[in-house]
Regions:
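Mature catalytic domains of secreted/periplasmic carbohydrate-active enzymes
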Residues: 20-482
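Bacterial Sec-dependent N-terminal signal peptides
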Residues: 1-20
């Protein structure tokens, strides 16, 4: 934790000097630090939207990348039995992926309505796929059209609209920060397949700089980096331009995916990414991303039970923040430009909870312990950052055979927040003696009391009935306790 405080303090110090110049190497780039707003904002919306939103299909296989609908083109090309059988039966064996482009119309796209949903969700920033691995761009990219030899962006293609620009304006008008996911590689780009060095210097570099210069993102979520090292991608050179000469030198935040050798490293310049994972080291700035279902892109094959409940999503956010991270929660819009209503409903439910309890989330830090466990054997928790099969809702579910999470904790300055998953007549924080005995439930005017009992601090909840709680989970604020 001391390391994280140092990183944030160092970040503030570096931004005091406008004369800082960064060389094209990680030693220099890591001196830049990460803008403090990112770690404070905690919650963002991820959007996967592209040509894959037309077939919008993947088999539903939990904890497997095979469930990613946005990988449709790659899967049918590699002959995946699930994707290939679906494609051949619905579209025909000779139907080419490029033929989905005229079907990507976005005719019902209303960026203001999207932005309103995001605002109401309580998210503080939004990250849109400017370009996924298929190479199709949501803004007017001349490099895309030139190197694909066809209209391969939303402006010159069928939508005839700057989808990225329109959403960017609406999101910023709603008071949120806007960022972009950008794939370094493109599966079947002719230039990528024939001359990777030329692809980097003549396609990627000018395209990336065009995106940044025109739209000025607050976040860049790079991906598709694993095919080559950071040296082969010339990533340090590109990031030196971003930090020194771009229009977003002070504000932009970047992830750790800039070469097959960069994930989890360079924590001075990049935040660490986890994908359907079990979380990261709380001493670094990290972000967990996952969908509401098993896919990032919209998957029509998912059923109601494949979507996380609103309560499970709220617990996911609480859990990630309690462990010192950010949550980037993904939605997959349909090809017609609408956000599936069930996804909207989940986001609004999260926002309703945050309206009452946001004090325990935004601007907080991880406490010395993220959880308090019940008595019993703790379930084994794998630490993978990819497809870990991890569920905060399951960890917090009372059971007889193993221990479960009774409470989650966050802190802000001298205040401790105890987040309780379900009503309990008594909250007992083990081994804790607060510096002051001032307790209240967020969103409630009911008086509750706390007392010391040996080494434990007990909060009496008996003055409240379960239906008198404003929200579940509920939050007990222990003011000046630390």
């Amino acid at each position: 934790m001391k390391k994280l405080v140092f990183l944030l303090s160092f970040t503030l110090a570096t931004y005091m000097s406008n004369a800082q110049h960064y060389e094209a190497n990680w030693e220099s780039l890591n001196k830049r630090g990460i803008p403090a707003w990112f770690h404070q904002d905690k919650f963002g919306i991820f959007i996967h939207w592209g040509l894959y939103s037309v077939p919008s299909y993947a088999p539903v296989i939990p904890n497997s990348g095979e469930s990613y609908a946005e990988w449709y083109w790659y899967r049918i090309r590699e002959g995946n039995k699930h994707f290939r059988a679906f494609h051949d039966s619905v579209y025909g064996k000779n139907f080419q992926y490029q033929q989905f482009e005229p079907m990507f119309k976005a005719e019902l796209f209303d960026p203001k309505q999207w932005a309103d949903v995001f605002k109401r969700s309580g998210a503080r920033y939004v990250v849109l796929t400017s370009k996924h691995h298929e190479g199709y761009c949501l803004w007017d990219s001349k490099e895309a059209d030139r190197d694909w030899g066809r209209a391969w962006n939303a402006v010159t293609g069928t939508p005839q609209r700057d989808l990225l620009g329109d959403l960017t304006n609406a999101v910023r008008d709603a008071g949120l920060k806007m960022g972009y996911y950008y794939s370094l590689y493109e599966w079947f780009n002719p230039l990528w397949q024939t001359d990777k060095e030329k692809f980097v210097t003549e396609h990627l570099f000018p395209q990336f700089k065009d995106l940044v210069t025109k739209y000025k993102p607050s976040v860049i979520f790079s991906d598709g980096e694993w095919e080559m090292s950071d040296t082969a991608w010339h990533s340090p050179e590109l990031l030196a331009w971003l930090f020194n000469d771009s229009p977003v030198t002070k504000d932009v935040v970047i992830d750790d995916r800039w070469g097959g050798n960069t994930r989890g490293k360079n924590t001075g310049a990049t935040y660490t990414t986890s994908e359907y994972g079990a979380g990261m080291d709380p001493n670094v700035i990290w972000e967990e991303s996952q969908g509401i279902g098993h896919s990032y892109g919209y998957n029509r094959n998912e059923q109601l039970d494949d979507y996380k409940t609103s309560n499970a999503l709220i617990l996911t956010l609480i859990d990630v923040v309690a462990r010192g991270g950010n949550l980037l929660l993904d939605i997959g819009p349909a090809a017609d430009g609408t956000i599936p209503v069930i996804m909207q409903q989940r986001l609004i439910d999260m926002g309703n909870w945050l309206q009452v309890n946001g004090e325990a989330i935004y601007g907080t830090e991880a406490w010395k312990q993220s959880y308090q466990w019940s008595e019993g054997k703790k379930p084994e928790k794998k630490g993978e950052s990819y497809m870990a099969g991890y569920s905060a809702a399951e960890l917090a579910k009372p059971r007889k055979d193993t221990a479960y999470v009774e409470y989650f904790f966050t802190r802000k300055d001298k205040d401790l927040f105890c987040i309780v998953p379900a009503y309990a007549p008594q909250v007992r924080i083990k081994g804790f003696r607060p510096a002051a005995n001032k307790v209240r439930i967020l969103g409630s005017n009911k008086t509750i009391t706390g007392k010391q009992s040996g080494n434990d601090f007990i909060i009496d909840m008996s003055s409240l009935k379960p239906d008198e709680l404003s929200t579940t989970p509920f939050v007990v604020r222990l003011q000046d306790a630390l």
